């Protein structure tokens, strides 16, 4: 509390010694009013001055102002960046409710930042704001898709082709090895917990895309440090739509979509397979005869059986208005039903959004109430079925048949599986696993989840001293999820469980999450003459609670399989306590200064290391406001920005890493024999570091914003350097010094640097024609600079599992290299450039191939350059647009090719798998050595360009006497991909760039309708 009082005292001192807001506010002719845009939305920060004097004020959060002029004939001038300036005499009735028109040549507007807003022209940090009209169009279900390719420095890696799949978002690369690299998501001033449980893992999935007004991405520390300990990976602020205008308006948006599989795993057709078997395993040999005997007489395309054409639809209705100019409101409901391209997969979502903003006491007191609810149901199809369908024998019947040809439902419910016997006598071949159809239809894995995100924000502007206001924010984010995972009676999976005995079984897992927020800050915003001061200090308290519980039952008897713990032992909680402040000061809108400070305490650390102080500072020079450029017709904007700051990281994967924790032993050798009572399992201690502390990231940023020809050409360029210290890493402990061989501790460092740019062009802008083109790109490089206490050049951490091989780890973390750098054997090729099976380079020249012959490549999944491109073209009521993104210098290990590069068959396994078409190219027919799986021949350049969406629409502004509007549009998503990568898709879900057999992302055709009443 002492920290907060110190900050507040600073504000009061500033208030005491700051010059008066105007020179004549206590006498003369009073003018009061509200300034709004053409949609009725209040404009915050508009300048209202008495022309020819220094008497001026700025509009408040509701666009309101009050000024005393010399007399009724005085000229009042109202201006705001990006809007046309209006001059009226003080007695004009138009000033009571003044609507500003947008200036087509202006490029600036108000941007939401942490704990407030700022004019874009006054920003000092690296901040990018994306408004609704700039979002990616199309049948968007996942909110993160609206940002894809839009923001330089923001890399969005989509999930697989499953409905509701989560994307991986990185802002300026990774800043940690073992802690989270996800950005902080803040929705309407409520920081969101990342872990929402199954079905709610992605916080952006909880928001209906149609409810979003804008995104603001805080990239550098000078902008993000106000969020302190959670801002090392950047901050994404999501602002939802609010009430506006006066007349109630109803809007509907809906779409119907058809999704098709964009690609299949490249395996042989039944005909190709038979021909190849005849060539490689001809009859007349022992092996050939056995292989030939396993050929069937059917032609089965298993991938066709498991994939389908999916139909999806989405509907949203919203009501927006303002009651008596005192209560803006907005309410919306939405429903999404999305089939997956894999049979049985499905995603449903229902959303409700409500916003009320009543104001009292002549708009000095404003209450903002936001409530968002979402209910989801997601059935997961087994991701393993994609690979299983690709390699199941294409010459066998997909079903067990009776003698009359009908399906034999008594044997594994009719679906073909490897085993012996029929009916109840069926014995599964557990080494081979369930068949593709059994995986889909005999298992139901469905998560149903509910989430509520809401807050009540009370903002009071002090009567008689309107420059000072107080803000109280009470927020709640609560979610619950229940996951059902069931195996049908009589299924292959039921027979593989010796306890189930063919009955089948099911389990329930419940997850509960609660995030409570209390924040209070004071803000002083004053303008006098050429000076503008905006200072804020606040306090934040946040509590996170979670509990998880699961239990299993048998289908036949519903008896419990395991113990049902009525009081879950995995309840966890953590707290964040913070004091923060920010000071913005500008002189003549030319010289801009920003200083922020946040003091955070996290219960995840001990009392000795709990507090972390995160400062930042920035300076910007509005060069375009200087006299030598102010009247320039060519240069409309030019601003230089410089910033430095520190942010922290406390999302370290554990709530109690500094405490000694005990775990129930699962090893029978770690038990105490109790005679007839059986074995008593020990509680064994885990390793811990009582001095574990924050990871700290220091960021340096230099940027230039520019605009030419009245904003027809505009953009920005940024250079940044991020250095993370006290990086968490698992290190080997000296014998006897801790309760484990390794312990997680602060010991490493890493560096991330890059250059970002953003370019926007308006080459055509006439009455009927408008053309806008946008392009942004990011060059980046990341490497470790320290990983342990010694300078051992050979120290490394191996990671990244592949399907085959011993140890299965293909990647490495090492000083001087990027995270997840590939660690391979070097392939040997013949004189024609063909790979020689099991021939690898003996790099240490000891006459044999060992692990010592692997080498650290200079290749990683992290792209050297990634970019986005967009185009919008309109002619009268027609509009056309597209969005695309791509990357260069990213590498992928084709694990699908590695694991299936030979036609060698284990004839004793009892099955005949299909072959990848790759075997015709490699010519590999023998068994691969353990080292061949790691060959760099499977490491491929996965640079690509993806056309994300193409859209064509027409807007009906008037139909008869109807005063509403309607837009009809057709679009295609995931249109095409240009790449040299041989796999299904060059964008691999996650961050490690290892491509097994991913669920292909579908191509979507959508018809959309938007109606405004």
What does each of the following model-derived ranges do?
Residues 135, 140, 182, 284-285, ...:
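Extracellular/periplasmic, surface-exposed regions of secreted and cell-surface proteins
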Residues 291-293, 437, 602, 834, ...:
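Extracytoplasmic gating/loop element in the C-terminal half of outer-membrane beta-barrel translocons
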